[in-house]
Amino acid sequence: MKVGIGLPSAVSPPDGRVVIEWAAAAEQAGFASVAVIDRLLAPTYDPLTVLAAAAAVTERAGLYTSVMLTPLRPVAVVASQAATVDQLSGGRLSLGVAVGSRRPDYAAVGVPFERRGRVLDAQLAGLRRAWAEPDGFTAAGPVPRTPGGPPILLGGTSPAAVRRVAQHGCGWICGLGGAAGFAPMAETVRDRWHQAGRDGAPRLLSIVNFALGPRAAEVSASFLRRYYGAAPFVEAMVRGTATTLSQVRAELDAHRQAGCDEVLLFPCAADLSQLELAAETL
């Protein structure tokens, strides 16, 4: 099982120098990938812009959006930006996408909240069409370095999210519940994948939030409550955050036993010491 790490691009206020330093240090420390999360109405960096910067200071690490709320953006823009990052990185991008749960974000861009799932369905088909052109550029920008486009991973636990994995995706990202939440949903995803007649197996990833060192529990709770606001799952995220090295190791072991392909450790603080401590679990 691989272990990647999130970049502190959402830890408020984000610092560009720190984010880029994290990306370079993550690869040097042995993490398999770096990842970013996404919000619109928040003091956070744009996910694909961050990954373009990360691509410039890394050579091997995978680059993940985990996840990007693509229904908030025109599909042609997503296709062009993702293809650009894939080209700049030499084919290291994996595009994790989901619909999100924040009504104000959708109101800000004029997309009806109730239609966000249907918008994503249309986008998934549109991305593949945009990336299928044989020439160097499509109507939506450059052709990706990866033939057919970057792997698309779906976030979410609804029946619709699982359906999208089987119909359009290369895999699934678990965003809630740690290993205890990952294991049963992973089995559901695998079953739906095979029912759809897909070959092989879906890629299965999971996010584990962490904070380490003095006041780790306080720091992580403050960040998660501030970032996610009144979302109904926030307190469960707070309780599930790993705040000691032994808890991080336990989560990694449990995910490994459940058949996870890669765990993404997401920091709740931006100090580089967080990455250095997390690297002790590799």
Q: What residue spans do the PLM features occupy?
A:
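Active-site-adjacent structural elements that line small-molecule/cofactor binding pockets in enzymes
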Residues: 1-282
